[in-house]
Amino acid sequence: MTASESFVGMQVLAQDKEVKATFIALDRKLPANLKVPYMKNAKYRTCICPSSNHLVDDCVCEDVIIAYTAHRNNAVAALLYSDGNVIHRSGTLKPKSQNRFDLRGFLTSVNPGESSRNEAGASKSTQKTYDRKDKSPSKSRNSKKGAKKSSSARKKKEYSSNSETDLSSDSDANTRKSKRK
């Protein structure tokens, strides 16, 4: 069966409250109808995710794919269809090089790759701190004992300073009362 024989017709997707809410959140105009071509043979079913034209099996979204057999997120499908007209391939997004990505972030953010870069930078910095801790285990044990002594000394200083401020605040309150009388 060829692709032309497999083509049945345009399938209109139903719009529910979730789809309308998604379009409102994205500040997009809700199209009158979402039309998607339906193919009998799965071999010719192309994915309608926001990346460029490819087969369902080759989708970079992996488990978030929207195949023609199960439209779980009509809003994503509608990104390719504006008022029933297909956006040209040059207007669609290029496939992602990552295995998986957050589709919600993909829809709302300007540059979806930023969050993954930030996470990678954070993991590198935490790895550096772990490496520093591993280099001097004997120093850390000695410093803990010193830290206990210094913390108790700090507490004593804080307690004495707090009691002095309490006394001064009490005396200030007494002077205010006497001035009122």
Swiss-Prot record:
Amino acid composition bias (Low complexity), ranges on this chain: 160-172
Region (Disordered): 106-181
Alphabetically ordered keywords of this record: Host cytoplasm, RNA-binding
GO molecular function: RNA binding
Localization annotation: Host cytoplasm
GO cellular component terms listed in the entry, alphabetical order: host cell cytoplasm
One Pfam short name: Pns11_12
Family recorded in the similarity comment: Belongs to the phytoreovirus RNA-binding protein family.
Function: Constituent of viral factories. Binds to ssRNA and dsRNA.
Protein name: RNA-binding protein
